[in-house]
Amino acid sequence: MIALLSPAKTLDLTKPNLDIETSKPIFISEAEVIMNNLKELEIQDLCPLMKISEDLGVQTFTKIQDWNTIYYGDEKPFVLSFKGEAYRGLDADDFTKEDLEFCNDSLRILSGLYGALKPLDGTKAYRLEMGTKISIDGSKNLYDFWGNKIMEAVLKDLENHKEKVIINLASNEYYKSIKKIEKKVRVITPVFKERKGIEYKVVTVYAKKARGQMVRYITKNRITKSEDIKNFDLDGYEFNERLSEGDTWVFTRD
């Protein structure tokens, strides 16, 4: 069983006091191709392409120009660097070395630049969303550039797991890059809803955090069987069998 999560736009590169070796992303060669294309762009090209302000464009331009493929094994792990809502829910800062190692086996972080990241892959500062409309070496967009590579990498990792199931906690933008995996293995998609009057509705900011909390729950409880995630109970959520349908598992809270 492997869970999928989207990356965050914000990165914190402050190094933690942690004695654990980081790894080089498996698609570093592909990332280099993408970055070489981005290095040719000026700030005035990046801003409309990435839909960012000029100030953020300057920061992004610097990150792109500084990016390289040199790894020393002591970089900050991506799972500790990402700082979006999902990663606030995951809250990996208090993970033990054993937690991080389990998480490294059971989670893959989808990425526009790196394809698929392991949590303990070393961080290089970047900004590139999967939905960015950029052509790389003749491809139509990043989905076209990545093709089946991300799916094949995750399937290969899944071979080492007893249960061949994907827990999809990624956003639609990122899951689209691996959606064909549904034809190969079972995919369970948890959905998190809040009570609003007499109904339950998805509230984006809470749903993002809950996705990270689900990864935390899987990690801390060493869950390897998908059925066990139905016991997820962090922050008042509980599995709602009535609202769930097929492999779309709904978790609600009042």
UniProtKB/Swiss-Prot annotation:
Pfam families attached here?
H2O2_YaaD
Q: Which InterPro entries match?
A: YaaA
| Gene Ontology terms: biological process | response to hydroperoxide
Q: List GO terms (cellular component aspect).
A: cytosol
Q: Which family does it belong to?
A: Belongs to the UPF0246 family.
Q: What is this protein called?
A: UPF0246 protein CPF_2407
